[in-house]
Amino acid sequence: VATRKFFQTGKTNMAAKKNTRSKSAKREPQATVGIIGGSGLYSMGGLTDAREIKVKTPFGDPSDAIVLGTLEGKRVAFLARHGRGHRILPSEINYRANVYAMKLLGVERIISVSAVGSLKEDLKPGEFLVADQFFDRTKDRKSTFFGDGLVAHVAFAHPTCGQLSSVLADACVHEAIMVHRRGTYICIEGPQFSTLAEAEVNRQLRFEVIGMTNVTEAKLAREAEICYATIAMITDYDCWHPEHESVTTSQIIATLTQNAENSQKVLRTAVRELPSERTCKCGSALQHSLVTDLKIVPKKTKKRLAAIIGKYIS
């Protein structure tokens, strides 16, 4: 019976489609702000009415169950990037599922909280940086939703949302946490830390911080028309600083504890101060980016990307 209904044509089928679109349009978002916590931030304090949900996506399962709740009067979705217990390598993270799950929940803004190494003397462990640029040195990650008959090229000159980044930086100031309002985050594949030669080259290129995850998320968030900004929590000087021993996991964890506590304060303040409406261009990133004639896009591809491209399909 289900098979026959699926292949029905004519007015009945058209009415069903119209009804489905109508229901979809009326559906309220379960969250408008997404928080992706990195090393050291595996849960979000201060959430009320918190509950866990498992979100299924066309790209597989996210890193963990997503925690939904209310923070400072706004609906928030929290996801531990590496899974609770820190069990997923940077290269193993299902970035597409993580970002798509946020889109399915109605998230319009993603705040990333990530541990990074410093490549400059004046960027000290314990301080925060709100990155405004990324440099991608990852090797073999799936960093696009597109393909399979649909080509899109989104603008990525400015990879983070200026409005969201400004709110994050101001929140750091409000909480008396030293913050650097701009800088380039170089993203490496990992999981190994840099060699001394690599660190020196990165410094010569005048990058500010180094991490292993954020550029992939930023690319996917842009394709999903979600604002994205990073709180980069500095834990160490990588391996280049002559007066500091080479970076070790224990050194990072010690600083992470302090940074995680500070990040919770910043997140609460930032979420409270976020304007209800977006005035940036992130929400229309695909408007002039879809290259393929949508009439010839395979139905399977349209279905898989419905949450992202639905508003552009007539």
Regions found by a protein language model. Give the residues of each.
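His/Asp/Glu-rich mid-to-C-terminal helical/loop segments that flank catalytic regions of hydrolases
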Residues: 239-286
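Generic non-transmembrane alpha-helical segments
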Residues: 163, 167-178, 265-273
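Active-site/ligand-binding-proximal alpha/beta "capping" segment
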Residues: 174-208, 295
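A short, charged, Gly/Pro-tolerant segment at domain boundaries
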Residues: 279-314
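Non-catalytic positions within long, well-ordered alpha-helices that form the structural scaffold/packing
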Residues: 103-106, 203, 222
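N-terminal amphipathic/basic-hydrophobic helices that include classical n-h-c signal peptides
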Residues: 1-20
